[in-house]
Amino acid sequence: FGFMFAADAHVKAATDDLFALSIKEQEFQKNEAFTGVELVHDTHRLALMNAMLHGIESPIYLGDTLSSFGKDFRGYDIVLTNPPFGTKKGGERATRDDFTYPTSNKQLNFLQHIYRSLNTNGKARAAVVLPDNVLFADGDGEKIRRDLMEKCNLHTILRLPTGIFYAQGVKTNVLFFTRGTQDTGNTREIWFYDLRSDMPSFGKTNPLKESHFDEFVACYASGDLSARHETWSEDNPNGRWRRYTYEEILARDKTSLDITWMKSGSDTDDYTLTELLEQIKTKSTSIANAVAALEELLGEVDE
Protein backbone atom coordinates (compact mmCIF):
# COMPACT_ATOMS: atom_id res chain seq x y z
CA PHE A 1 0.00 0.00 0.00
CA GLY A 2 3.03 2.24 -0.28
CA PHE A 3 1.77 3.73 -3.56
CA MET A 4 -1.52 4.70 -1.88
CA PHE A 5 0.16 6.48 1.00
CA ALA A 6 2.67 8.18 -1.29
CA ALA A 7 -0.17 9.40 -3.53
CA ASP A 8 -2.04 10.71 -0.49
CA ALA A 9 1.07 12.55 0.70
CA HIS A 10 1.54 14.05 -2.79
CA VAL A 11 -2.04 15.37 -2.87
CA LYS A 12 -1.77 16.80 0.64
CA ALA A 13 1.54 18.51 -0.17
CA ALA A 14 -0.05 20.14 -3.24
CA THR A 15 -3.21 21.27 -1.40
CA ASP A 16 -1.88 22.64 1.91
CA ASP A 17 -2.80 19.41 3.70
CA LEU A 18 -6.20 19.49 1.89
CA PHE A 19 -7.10 22.95 3.28
CA ALA A 20 -6.91 24.43 -0.24
CA LEU A 21 -9.82 22.17 -1.23
CA SER A 22 -13.51 22.74 -0.68
CA ILE A 23 -15.23 20.87 2.15
CA LYS A 24 -16.79 18.50 -0.37
CA GLU A 25 -13.42 17.83 -2.01
CA GLN A 26 -11.80 17.26 1.38
CA GLU A 27 -14.43 14.69 2.30
CA PHE A 28 -13.97 12.93 -1.03
CA GLN A 29 -10.19 12.88 -0.67
CA LYS A 30 -10.41 11.47 2.84
CA ASN A 31 -13.21 8.93 2.38
CA GLU A 32 -13.52 8.00 -1.31
CA ALA A 33 -10.40 8.88 -3.30
CA PHE A 34 -8.61 5.56 -2.74
CA THR A 35 -9.49 1.89 -2.91
CA GLY A 36 -7.30 -0.94 -1.68
CA VAL A 37 -7.61 -4.73 -1.67
CA GLU A 38 -5.57 -7.24 0.32
CA LEU A 39 -5.78 -11.02 0.31
CA VAL A 40 -3.99 -11.86 3.59
CA HIS A 41 -5.76 -11.16 6.90
CA ASP A 42 -2.74 -9.96 8.88
CA THR A 43 -1.51 -7.73 6.06
CA HIS A 44 -5.04 -6.34 5.70
CA ARG A 45 -5.06 -5.35 9.38
CA LEU A 46 -1.69 -3.63 8.98
CA ALA A 47 -2.97 -1.76 5.93
CA LEU A 48 -6.03 -0.54 7.84
CA MET A 49 -3.86 0.63 10.72
CA ASN A 50 -1.45 2.39 8.37
CA ALA A 51 -4.32 4.08 6.55
CA MET A 52 -5.74 5.31 9.85
CA LEU A 53 -2.36 6.75 10.84
CA HIS A 54 -2.27 8.61 7.50
CA GLY A 55 -5.79 9.96 7.96
CA ILE A 56 -7.20 7.86 5.11
CA GLU A 57 -10.69 6.45 5.60
CA SER A 58 -11.19 5.16 2.06
CA PRO A 59 -12.18 1.49 1.84
CA ILE A 60 -9.52 -1.22 2.01
CA TYR A 61 -11.17 -4.56 1.32
CA LEU A 62 -10.19 -8.07 2.35
CA GLY A 63 -10.53 -10.36 -0.64
CA ASP A 64 -9.07 -11.96 -3.76
CA THR A 65 -9.28 -9.75 -6.84
CA LEU A 66 -8.51 -12.77 -9.02
CA SER A 67 -11.77 -14.40 -7.90
CA SER A 68 -15.32 -13.29 -8.70
CA PHE A 69 -14.91 -10.78 -5.85
CA GLY A 70 -12.69 -8.67 -8.10
CA LYS A 71 -15.25 -8.25 -10.89
CA ASP A 72 -16.89 -5.28 -9.14
CA PHE A 73 -13.73 -3.16 -9.09
CA ARG A 74 -14.23 -1.01 -12.18
CA GLY A 75 -14.27 2.59 -13.32
CA TYR A 76 -11.03 3.71 -11.68
CA ASP A 77 -9.15 6.81 -12.86
CA ILE A 78 -5.66 5.77 -11.70
CA VAL A 79 -4.14 2.43 -10.71
CA LEU A 80 -0.71 2.21 -9.06
CA THR A 81 0.42 -1.25 -7.99
CA ASN A 82 3.16 -3.86 -7.74
CA PRO A 83 1.14 -7.10 -7.73
CA PRO A 84 2.59 -10.22 -6.08
CA PHE A 85 4.78 -12.49 -8.18
CA GLY A 86 4.36 -16.21 -8.71
CA THR A 87 1.45 -18.51 -9.50
CA LYS A 88 -1.93 -19.07 -7.94
CA LYS A 89 -1.88 -21.38 -4.90
CA GLY A 90 -1.68 -24.96 -6.06
CA GLY A 91 -1.08 -23.78 -9.65
CA GLU A 92 -4.78 -23.28 -10.39
CA ARG A 93 -6.07 -20.64 -12.76
CA ALA A 94 -7.91 -17.50 -11.71
CA THR A 95 -11.63 -18.00 -11.12
CA ARG A 96 -12.64 -14.76 -12.85
CA ASP A 97 -15.08 -15.60 -15.65
CA ASP A 98 -14.63 -12.14 -17.18
CA PHE A 99 -10.95 -12.74 -18.05
CA THR A 100 -10.49 -13.47 -21.73
CA TYR A 101 -7.24 -15.33 -21.02
CA PRO A 102 -7.30 -16.92 -17.53
CA THR A 103 -3.90 -18.34 -16.59
CA SER A 104 -2.04 -19.66 -13.55
CA ASN A 105 0.42 -16.75 -13.89
CA LYS A 106 -0.54 -14.20 -11.22
CA GLN A 107 1.10 -11.26 -12.94
CA LEU A 108 -0.71 -11.83 -16.23
CA ASN A 109 -4.04 -12.19 -14.40
CA PHE A 110 -3.42 -9.03 -12.39
CA LEU A 111 -2.51 -7.18 -15.58
CA GLN A 112 -5.85 -8.18 -17.11
CA HIS A 113 -7.64 -7.13 -13.92
CA ILE A 114 -5.91 -3.75 -13.93
CA TYR A 115 -6.62 -2.67 -17.48
CA ARG A 116 -10.18 -3.95 -17.24
CA SER A 117 -10.73 -1.96 -14.04
CA LEU A 118 -9.84 1.40 -15.63
CA ASN A 119 -12.45 3.95 -16.65
CA THR A 120 -13.04 3.96 -20.42
CA ASN A 121 -13.16 7.76 -20.77
CA GLY A 122 -9.76 7.88 -22.49
CA LYS A 123 -8.03 9.48 -19.48
CA ALA A 124 -7.75 6.66 -16.92
CA ARG A 125 -4.18 5.46 -16.54
CA ALA A 126 -2.03 2.96 -14.71
CA ALA A 127 1.58 2.37 -13.69
CA VAL A 128 2.29 -1.27 -12.83
CA VAL A 129 5.48 -3.00 -11.66
CA LEU A 130 5.83 -6.38 -13.37
CA PRO A 131 8.62 -8.96 -13.83
CA ASP A 132 10.36 -9.56 -17.15
CA ASN A 133 8.41 -12.75 -17.92
CA VAL A 134 5.27 -10.68 -18.55
CA LEU A 135 7.11 -9.04 -21.44
CA PHE A 136 8.06 -12.25 -23.26
CA ALA A 137 5.83 -15.13 -22.05
CA ASP A 138 4.32 -17.00 -24.99
CA GLY A 139 0.84 -18.51 -25.34
CA ASP A 140 -1.61 -16.58 -23.17
CA GLY A 141 1.19 -14.13 -22.34
CA GLU A 142 1.40 -12.98 -25.96
CA LYS A 143 -2.39 -12.82 -26.25
CA ILE A 144 -2.64 -10.67 -23.11
CA ARG A 145 0.06 -8.29 -24.36
CA ARG A 146 -1.81 -7.88 -27.63
CA ASP A 147 -5.09 -7.37 -25.75
CA LEU A 148 -3.44 -4.74 -23.55
CA MET A 149 -2.10 -2.87 -26.57
CA GLU A 150 -5.51 -2.98 -28.24
CA LYS A 151 -7.54 -1.79 -25.25
CA CYS A 152 -4.93 0.65 -23.91
CA ASN A 153 -2.25 2.99 -25.10
CA LEU A 154 0.81 1.22 -23.70
CA HIS A 155 3.05 4.22 -24.21
CA THR A 156 6.01 3.65 -21.87
CA ILE A 157 8.06 0.81 -20.39
CA LEU A 158 10.76 1.53 -17.80
CA ARG A 159 13.33 -1.26 -17.33
CA LEU A 160 14.32 -1.14 -13.67
CA PRO A 161 17.68 -2.15 -12.20
CA THR A 162 17.81 -5.75 -11.03
CA GLY A 163 16.49 -6.62 -7.57
CA ILE A 164 15.24 -3.23 -6.36
CA PHE A 165 11.58 -4.18 -5.89
CA TYR A 166 11.86 -7.80 -4.86
CA ALA A 167 14.61 -10.33 -4.22
CA GLN A 168 18.06 -9.88 -5.69
CA GLY A 169 18.09 -11.26 -9.22
CA VAL A 170 14.42 -10.51 -9.96
CA LYS A 171 14.19 -8.21 -12.98
CA THR A 172 11.26 -5.82 -13.09
CA ASN A 173 9.72 -3.13 -15.26
CA VAL A 174 7.12 -0.41 -14.90
CA LEU A 175 4.40 -0.42 -17.56
CA PHE A 176 2.61 2.89 -18.11
CA PHE A 177 -0.66 2.80 -20.04
CA THR A 178 -3.89 4.72 -20.59
CA ARG A 179 -7.22 2.99 -21.21
CA GLY A 180 -8.83 3.97 -24.51
CA THR A 181 -12.46 4.83 -25.20
CA GLN A 182 -12.58 1.93 -27.66
CA ASP A 183 -11.30 -1.63 -27.28
CA THR A 184 -9.06 -1.62 -30.35
CA GLY A 185 -6.23 0.35 -31.94
CA ASN A 186 -5.02 2.32 -28.93
CA THR A 187 -1.26 1.65 -28.96
CA ARG A 188 0.63 3.22 -31.86
CA GLU A 189 4.12 3.42 -30.38
CA ILE A 190 5.95 2.42 -27.19
CA TRP A 191 8.79 4.33 -25.57
CA PHE A 192 11.40 2.31 -23.67
CA TYR A 193 13.81 3.63 -21.05
CA ASP A 194 16.62 1.25 -20.06
CA LEU A 195 17.68 1.94 -16.49
CA ARG A 196 19.17 -1.55 -16.14
CA SER A 197 21.90 -2.05 -18.73
CA ASP A 198 25.37 -0.78 -17.85
CA MET A 199 24.22 0.34 -14.39
CA PRO A 200 26.02 -0.23 -11.07
CA SER A 201 24.87 -2.80 -8.54
CA PHE A 202 22.38 -1.25 -6.12
CA GLY A 203 22.11 -2.41 -2.53
CA LYS A 204 22.62 -1.30 1.04
CA THR A 205 26.03 0.19 0.29
CA ASN A 206 24.88 1.81 -2.96
CA PRO A 207 21.16 2.61 -2.65
CA LEU A 208 19.01 3.59 -5.59
CA LYS A 209 18.19 7.29 -5.29
CA GLU A 210 15.56 9.57 -6.77
CA SER A 211 18.30 11.29 -8.76
CA HIS A 212 18.85 8.08 -10.75
CA PHE A 213 15.44 8.69 -12.33
CA ASP A 214 16.07 12.33 -13.31
CA GLU A 215 16.77 11.60 -16.98
CA PHE A 216 13.78 9.28 -17.25
CA VAL A 217 11.47 11.90 -15.72
CA ALA A 218 12.75 14.50 -18.19
CA CYS A 219 12.33 12.09 -21.12
CA TYR A 220 8.87 11.03 -19.95
CA ALA A 221 7.76 14.66 -20.38
CA SER A 222 4.78 14.25 -18.03
CA GLY A 223 3.24 11.81 -20.46
CA ASP A 224 3.14 14.33 -23.34
CA LEU A 225 4.10 12.06 -26.24
CA SER A 226 4.47 14.96 -28.66
CA ALA A 227 7.21 16.48 -26.48
CA ARG A 228 9.33 13.33 -26.38
CA HIS A 229 12.66 12.97 -28.16
CA GLU A 230 14.82 9.85 -28.36
CA THR A 231 18.26 9.93 -26.76
CA TRP A 232 19.11 6.80 -28.76
CA SER A 233 20.33 7.14 -32.34
CA GLU A 234 22.72 5.34 -34.66
CA ASP A 235 25.33 7.87 -33.60
CA ASN A 236 24.47 7.36 -29.92
CA PRO A 237 23.66 3.63 -29.63
CA ASN A 238 23.81 3.74 -25.83
CA GLY A 239 21.07 6.31 -25.44
CA ARG A 240 18.64 4.93 -22.86
CA TRP A 241 15.42 6.36 -24.37
CA ARG A 242 14.13 4.76 -27.56
CA ARG A 243 10.85 4.59 -29.47
CA TYR A 244 9.38 1.56 -31.25
CA THR A 245 6.31 1.67 -33.46
CA TYR A 246 3.39 -0.69 -32.93
CA GLU A 247 4.24 -2.37 -36.24
CA GLU A 248 7.81 -3.00 -35.09
CA ILE A 249 6.51 -4.59 -31.89
CA LEU A 250 4.08 -6.85 -33.77
CA ALA A 251 6.89 -8.00 -36.05
CA ARG A 252 8.88 -9.30 -33.07
CA ASP A 253 8.80 -12.98 -32.14
CA LYS A 254 5.82 -13.63 -29.82
CA THR A 255 5.17 -9.87 -29.78
CA SER A 256 7.92 -9.66 -27.17
CA LEU A 257 8.30 -6.41 -25.26
CA ASP A 258 11.58 -7.56 -23.73
CA ILE A 259 13.75 -5.21 -25.77
CA THR A 260 17.37 -4.23 -25.21
CA TRP A 261 19.75 -2.40 -27.49
CA MET A 262 22.59 -1.06 -25.34
CA LYS A 263 25.83 -2.83 -26.22
CA SER A 264 28.36 -1.59 -23.67
CA GLY A 265 28.49 -3.19 -20.24
CA SER A 266 26.00 -5.85 -19.23
CA ASP A 267 23.34 -6.74 -16.72
CA THR A 268 25.95 -8.56 -14.62
CA ASP A 269 27.84 -6.70 -11.90
CA ASP A 270 30.62 -7.17 -9.39
CA TYR A 271 29.20 -7.80 -5.92
CA THR A 272 30.70 -7.42 -2.48
CA LEU A 273 30.90 -10.51 -0.25
CA THR A 274 28.00 -9.16 1.84
CA GLU A 275 25.85 -8.66 -1.26
CA LEU A 276 26.70 -12.17 -2.50
CA LEU A 277 25.67 -13.64 0.86
CA GLU A 278 22.39 -11.70 0.72
CA GLN A 279 21.70 -13.10 -2.75
CA ILE A 280 22.49 -16.65 -1.62
CA LYS A 281 20.13 -16.33 1.36
CA THR A 282 17.38 -14.86 -0.81
CA LYS A 283 17.71 -17.53 -3.48
CA SER A 284 17.80 -20.28 -0.84
CA THR A 285 14.53 -18.96 0.57
CA SER A 286 13.01 -18.79 -2.91
CA ILE A 287 14.05 -22.38 -3.63
CA ALA A 288 12.60 -23.56 -0.31
CA ASN A 289 9.32 -21.79 -1.07
CA ALA A 290 9.21 -23.30 -4.55
CA VAL A 291 9.81 -26.79 -3.15
CA ALA A 292 7.06 -26.27 -0.57
CA ALA A 293 4.64 -25.13 -3.28
CA LEU A 294 5.54 -28.14 -5.43
CA GLU A 295 5.02 -30.52 -2.51
CA GLU A 296 1.64 -28.93 -1.85
CA LEU A 297 0.68 -29.34 -5.50
CA LEU A 298 1.78 -32.98 -5.52
CA GLY A 299 -0.21 -33.54 -2.34
CA GLU A 300 -3.34 -32.20 -4.03
CA VAL A 301 -2.73 -34.49 -7.02
CA ASP A 302 -2.35 -37.52 -4.75
CA GLU A 303 -5.64 -36.67 -3.05
Report each predicted region and the residues it spans.
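A conserved structural/catalytic subdomain of Rossmann-like adenosyl-cofactor enzymes
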Residues: 70-303
